């Protein structure tokens, strides 16, 4: 099992380089991804041990802020967020390895994107370790372009169908349900793929699906960035982007399993919260004008079948 974990780690660290390099090629000023390598030592007072590399870009003309973060951590006991639906795992030791990214563009016409790919092994120090993969990618637009959502979902469907034709409808629905703000009765964006507890096939089959899915993120996102990054925008557009970013913050702090897991397990706070947008705003009881571009987005982000 250790060999398989290391193989996934090698894939993720190479993917991190591929993604940051591809994104930097679209940046038009001197902003670059900066590498922040960290390590939590094996000491008795640390709940979580391990290491990682958070790559951050800030202040770009195209990417106002972005993080592509790798981590490999282990602990003596899974936190409550990881065992809420699997009580049989309570008290087990664990290893978790993953890559998580969030990209916040400056231009309101370029959507925010998020992706995460991970493996968990519970009871890795026992004769019968329990493994599962999780991950996916999702898109959060501020202004609607139907062709962008279609391209995003078509890319997701193509990679799923290569492995299992039941995956796309199942993981698309799961994504719509997961990235939903109950207190707002709103979806965070137009969704994509979300899966967890993936171990329905052999390890190698699941590994191949997850790595193919991870490799397709750039195919899904880069064409949208290239198409929208030079669209002129007004202060009104920017203000609406900042207002909608507030929903992103609310979801991450209230519902996101990765954030909750990291904080409950004593993870590295700076890396866990690096996905937050650089600026977000809240307006009391604000409502968009009827018929405005801003009002349209609330219909646009409702779950639908994007691929006819």
Swiss-Prot record:
Keyword Transcription regulation among UniProt keywords: no
Domain of life: Bacteria
Binding site for a divalent metal cation: 104, 114, 153, 183
UniProt keyword annotations, A-Z: Cytoplasm, Heme biosynthesis, Metal-binding, Oxidoreductase, Porphyrin biosynthesis
InterPro entries per UniProt: Coprogen_oxidase_aer, Coprogen_oxidase_aer_sf, Coprogen_oxidase_CS
Binding site for substrate: 100, 116-118, 266-268
A Gene Ontology cellular-component term: cytoplasm
Site, as annotated: Important for dimerization: 183
Enzyme Commission (EC) number: 1.3.3.3
Listed transmembrane segments: none
Important for dimerization: region residues: 248-283
GO biological process assignments: protoporphyrinogen IX biosynthetic process
Catalyzed reactions: coproporphyrinogen III + O2 + 2 H(+) = protoporphyrinogen IX + 2 CO2 + 2 H2O
Alphabetized Gene3D superfamilies for the sequence: Coproporphyrinogen III oxidase, aerobic
Location relative to the cell: Cytoplasm
Cofactor(s) recorded in Swiss-Prot or TrEMBL: a divalent metal cation
Pathway membership, UniProt: Porphyrin-containing compound metabolism; protoporphyrin-IX biosynthesis; protoporphyrinogen-IX from coproporphyrinogen-III (O2 route): step 1/1
Residues of the active site: 114 (proton donor)
Protein purpose: Involved in the heme biosynthesis. Catalyzes the aerobic oxidative decarboxylation of propionate groups of rings A and B of coproporphyrinogen-III to yield the vinyl groups in protoporphyrinogen-IX.
Entries under HAMAP family matching the protein: Coprogen_oxidas (MF_00333)
Record-stated family: Belongs to the aerobic coproporphyrinogen-III oxidase family.
Protein name listed in UniProt: Oxygen-dependent coproporphyrinogen-III oxidase
Organism of provenance: Francisella tularensis subsp. tularensis (strain SCHU S4 / Schu 4)
Gene: hemF
């Amino acid at each position: 099992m250790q060999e398989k974990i290391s193989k996934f780690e090698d894939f993720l660290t190479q993917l991190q380089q591929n993604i940051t390099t591809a994104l930097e090629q679209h940046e038009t000023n001197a902003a670059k991804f900066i590498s922040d390598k960290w390590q939590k030592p094996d000491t008795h007072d640390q709940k979580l041990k391990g290491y990682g590399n958070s790559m951050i870009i800030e202040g770009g003309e195209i990417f106002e802020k972005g993080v592509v973060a790798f981590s490999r951590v282990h602990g003596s006991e899974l936190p409550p967020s990881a065992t809420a639906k699997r009580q049989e795992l309570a008290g087990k030791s664990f290893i978790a390895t993953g890559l998580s990214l969030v990209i916040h563009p400056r231009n309101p016409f370029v959507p925010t994107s998020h992706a995460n790919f991970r493996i968990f092994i519970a009871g890795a120090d026992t004769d019968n370790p329990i493994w599962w993969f999780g991950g996916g990618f999702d898109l959060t637009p501020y202004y609607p372009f139907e062709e962008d959502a279609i391209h995003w979902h078509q890319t997701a469907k193509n990679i799923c169908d290569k492995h299992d034709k039941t995956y796309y409808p199942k993981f698309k629905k799961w994504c719509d349900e997961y990235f939903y703000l109950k207190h707002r009765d709103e979806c965070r964006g137009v969704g994509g793929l979300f899966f967890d507890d993936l171990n329905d096939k052999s390890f190698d089959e699941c590994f191949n699906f997850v790595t193919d899915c991870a490799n397709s993120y750039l195919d899904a996102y880069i064409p949208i960035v290239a198409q929208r990054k030079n669209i002129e925008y007004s202060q009104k557009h920017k203000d609406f982007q900042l207002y909608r970013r507030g929903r992103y913050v609310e979801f991450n702090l209230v519902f996101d399993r990765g954030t909750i897991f990291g904080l409950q397990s004593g993870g590295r706070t700076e890396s866990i919260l690096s996905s937050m947008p650089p600026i977000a705003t809240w307006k009391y009881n604000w409502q968009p004008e009827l018929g405005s571009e801003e009002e349209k987005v609330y219909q646009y982000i409702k779950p639908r079948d994007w691929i006819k």
